[in-house]
Swiss-Prot record:
It comes from the Bacteria. Transmembrane segments: none annotated. SUPFAM superfamilies: Actin-like ATPase domain. ATP binds at residues 12-19. Catalyzes the specific phosphorylation of 1,6-anhydro-N-acetylmuramic acid (anhMurNAc) with the simultaneous cleavage of the 1,6-anhydro ring, generating MurNAc-6-P. Is required for the utilization of anhMurNAc either imported from the medium or derived from its own cell wall murein, and thus plays a role in cell wall recycling. This is Anhydro-N-acetylmuramic acid kinase. The keyword ATP-binding applies. GO terms for biological process: 1,6-anhydro-N-acetyl-beta-muramic acid catabolic process; amino sugar metabolic process; peptidoglycan turnover. The gene is anmK. PANTHER family: ANHYDRO-N-ACETYLMURAMIC ACID KINASE (PTHR30605:SF0). Belongs to the anhydro-N-acetylmuramic acid kinase family.
Amino acid sequence: MTMKRAIGLMSGTSLDGIDVALIESDGESIRIVKSANGFIAPLGPTGYRGYREDEKTLLREATRDAEGIRARADRPGRLPQAEDFVTHAHAEAIEAFLAENGLSPADIDVVGFHGQTVIHRPKLGLTVQIGDGAALARRLGIRVVSDMRADDVAQGGQGAPLVPVFHKALAEAAGFAGPLGILNIGGLANATLIDSSGNMLAFDTGPGNGPINDWMKERTGRDLDEDGATAARGTVDKDLLENLLGHPLILRQPPKSLDRNWFSHRLAGYLTIEDGAATLTAFTAHAVARSLAFASERPTRWIVGGGGAKNRTLMTMLERLLKAEVLNADAIGWSSDFLEAQAFAYLALRALEGLPLTYPTTTGVSEPVTGGLVSEP
């Protein structure tokens, strides 16, 4: 198949902003430049459009209002305003990205638009990512693929995680053999496990940065625990940690996908700022480690992306608990910040070709499923 240029967009549950990334792929192989040591050069240019505080507030309020959704088309409370904002902000992000990189809409074959998840209840057959793909396509003059989780959920899958097929393709392109773990730590954490035969298992492991960020925002006014410095000064409350790890969703057999709102920072409310940060950070790390009970082979190497890869305390905990080599994605030429945006560019190309986005071992769907809603400009 012909290599095409795709832009991927990701606005995660951490609500920090919009990641933009361009890749070249045919929906199967990925164009890379590989160095002698097996590491790779960046896949393509990237960009970012941060959210202002008032914009974050709107999205938080819309997410709370989303608890009232009973059907996918429902938009109670502030959701209509938030959906318009999400579409507009993503358009701004791409327009700025194109200008910064000397590109025009004609240079891009497709945009993969994830939107903003406001509710994810796969057992109820419900997943909603706000953002209007058709309106985005009209404004940009570029074909857009959006709503990539819905088909999987409609066919009995968890609708998440979606990135494993990209993880596997990137690992193969870079020459990394299994047993390998690829961990993305955003608001939630999800793992892709590739065994020595190339078989793939993927699932959400539990909380990511979400509870830590919420804790820091509430206690300090800061958006995150920079470099894990606050957690590093604290002591883990072992009793609370064991209580948190007893959450039924942590213990559930894959396939499983989780909702950010199922893990609250408020359970640590009686602790000091430092001890709360340490305990919530340990919760994320231990949930990943306990997920290895579901693996056919224990990975000997982990590649970590997402905001959590920049949390030194979390990375240290992971290295100790996983008893394996733990690498920041940036250190091997991958992108810890833009891995998910790159994945949605890749998924958009697969959707155009009718290739599967999800598999029984990634979402629990009964057979491989493609997906996505294609909107022409």
